[in-house]
């Protein structure tokens, strides 16, 4: 794993750490379920405190189209073993008394959703990876990829004025806001783009 700076030095340290499993498509639902299940075991496996709390989540719909959307998402989540319950407005009010429910057309409750400490989750994942033989190199920037016959063949890197190349047949592009640019360099479209967000102290 090549990390251009230090692990968690990007936006990870101030992320909300929300663990939600209600997603818009099949693959994202499967990934969210896998991640939530993994995060509940990480602390025991690595000894790194993750702050994982399964406090549950509520999703509400105020329009008919949103109602159909969350009910479809709930059905898909259920098919993958995610615990999700459609609840009445009365049950919604009991779970969250501050919420005005008069205009709510549908609500779902996911009791295994929750929150974690994103920086510590990343460190626990890194420790678990190292325990399983992964080598992590910090302060190493990926500068390019080579391909041969339509497949990746090597990764070029730069670190503190030194450069190098790693021969490989597989690359996982985890470059965050630079993933699109890195993919484009070898003709791969990565459907990501950077967007502004806010953090209030």
Give the residues covered by each predicted segment.
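Short beta-to-alpha linker loops that shape the active-site pocket of alpha/beta-hydrolase fold enzymes
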Residues: 5-7, 92, 125
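Central beta-strand plus flanking loop segment that forms part of the substrate or channel wall
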Residues: 16-21, 57-59, 187-201
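Dinucleotide-binding Rossmann-like beta1-alpha1 core, especially the glycine-rich loop
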Residues: 17-95
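Conserved beta-strand segments of alpha/beta enzyme cores
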Residues: 83-85, 135, 189
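Helical element adjacent to the flavin cofactor pocket in flavoenzyme catalytic cores
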Residues: 108-170, 174-181
């Amino acid at each position: 794993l090549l990390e251009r700076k230090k692990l968690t030095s990007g936006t990870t340290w101030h992320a909300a750490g929300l663990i939600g499993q209600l997603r818009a498509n099949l693959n994202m639902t499967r990934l969210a379920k896998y991640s939530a299940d993994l995060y509940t075991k990480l602390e025991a496996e690595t000894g790194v405190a993750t702050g994982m709390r399964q406090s549950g989540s509520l999703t509400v719909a105020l329009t008919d189209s949103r109602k159909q959307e969350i009910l479809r998402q709930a059905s898909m989540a259920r098919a993958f073993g995610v615990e999700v319950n459609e609840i009445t407005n009365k049950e919604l009010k009991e779970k969250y008394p501050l919420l005005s429910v008069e205009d709510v057309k549908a609500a779902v409750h996911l009791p295994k959703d929750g929150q974690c400490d994103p920086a510590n989750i990343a460190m626990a994942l890194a420790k678990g990876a190292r325990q399983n033989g992964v080598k992590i190199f910090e302060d190493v920037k990926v500068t390019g990829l080579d391909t041969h016959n339509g497949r990746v063949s090597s990764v070029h890197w730069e670190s503190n004025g030194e450069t190098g190349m790693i021969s490989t047949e597989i690359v996982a592009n985890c470059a965050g806001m630079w993933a699109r640019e890195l993919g484009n360099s070898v003709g791969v479209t990565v459907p990501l783009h950077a967007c502004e967000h806010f953090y209030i102290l």
